[in-house]
């Protein structure tokens, strides 16, 4: 139950009864919880339509509200705010209801939808680096959130395995090892099962090949020709390319596994290649495609968005072509209700073109919504894209090692590697996901690793503190679900209990915002606020030495609720919680 929605529906009945549009009855969480819990600001915009002062409208609304079981206090403040304070029993009962529900008050979306999530997107032959973490962590959080809310999710890594970089690699290897059988056009036998290069060598070859092609137009033409021949099915090139893909996927899977990020599909641009001819024929049959200066293009029919080049002058296909073919493939194979691309904002124009063409040509069905989650860049303290001290790109494995080093330095007596890894992952993931995805942000590992403030280790520390209370009372193998039947939250005895209850019942609000806006930072902010409320409760509301048994059990119930809410919230952003720290 989203408490904002519940209160809005309660007020909407009064608005309707008085002849006002229900849309003005929206209730939001107050930014001043010391003054009120929630507020309704609808009287101000409503005044223009009702031809009444907003203060008079607000007073009229409050006069007609009859819900003493929900509200302890309803006050009107200038120029027309309705300030809401919840009744203590309603607050306690709602907290209990959430504690005893599987998803802490979150209800499944109805009807359930099928959502394809395209994220990760590493390129073959390139090791993953710090710049890849945004797509990986944001996409993983979104798949967790969508599944939690009841959607059927299909996640696809969508490897970059079919572009000009493949031709660059082929030509570079041909230059250094021309004797390899892959380059003999007359060869008809079986190709070796082992790759002629390792993934480490591939990572060294690509920058060299890229540099050569950028500095020499003739070398670039060779790479383009090799790419074209690969896409046309030249046997030796296909066999060599298959080696590139296999060894790259093996390495990338290890990187994603280290982040606890997993995919349902490991497809790439190449997997859509077999659909391109069918799709082009469809475009031609329906007069969507036309020739322009030797290339074949499709108009987007959107102001300011240029046509999409589908086939180049040389007959090769473009990045946009394979993206369209991927949409074609996903529509036929999966029939999704939504496809979400988690790709950085520098690709915004590209996706506007692809989405516009896909919708105009009906590559996707009318029911299918296309969304680009366009995230900002990961920058260092200097405001530029994050680099190592030596000025190079930091590989993901090195970043994780650094995070573990920070965790170990702050806990020198901790010898459990699994706990160090959990702290390191919380450091990296929370440090990234606490930011609104649309913004660039500064990646400061030293700051993210602090055990105080808005950090992952602070959240872990808080939950471990709450768990230790329960462990001291119930032993190591306690089960919150079964215990919650006998431990009930009661009306708050002080402001710390009240604020903790109020924070707990806002969990469904945070989840809904994260779900609807593809913004996991709402869950991060919720978890941080809940951690603050619990730590104040912990300091000011003793449990172990209480003589009042009913109050003791009520506070234990609040500890249970905190552990449950924090555990679910942490899991939604891909963070696992240790038993101790």
Curated annotation (Swiss-Prot):
Keywords: Aminoacyl-tRNA synthetase, ATP-binding, Cytoplasm, Ligase, Nucleotide-binding, Protein biosynthesis. A motif ('HIGH' region) lies at residues 122-132. The keyword Nucleotide-binding applies. Monomer. Gene3D superfamilies: Arginyl tRNA synthetase N-terminal domain (3.30.1360.70), HUPs (3.40.50.620), Isoleucyl-tRNA Synthetase, Domain 1 (1.10.730.10). GO terms for molecular function: arginine-tRNA ligase activity; ATP binding. SUPFAM superfamilies: Anticodon-binding domain of a subclass of class I aminoacyl-tRNA synthetases, Arginyl-tRNA synthetase (ArgRS), N-terminal 'additional' domain, Nucleotidylyl transferase. This is Arginine--tRNA ligase. The keyword ATP-binding applies. Belongs to the class-I aminoacyl-tRNA synthetase family. GO terms for biological process: arginyl-tRNA aminoacylation. It is found in: Cytoplasm. PANTHER family: ARGININE--TRNA LIGASE, CYTOPLASMIC (PTHR11956:SF5), ARGINYL-TRNA SYNTHETASE (PTHR11956). Its EC number is 6.1.1.19. GO terms for cellular component: cytoplasm. It catalyses: tRNA(Arg) + L-arginine + ATP = L-arginyl-tRNA(Arg) + AMP + diphosphate. CDD domains: ArgRS_core.
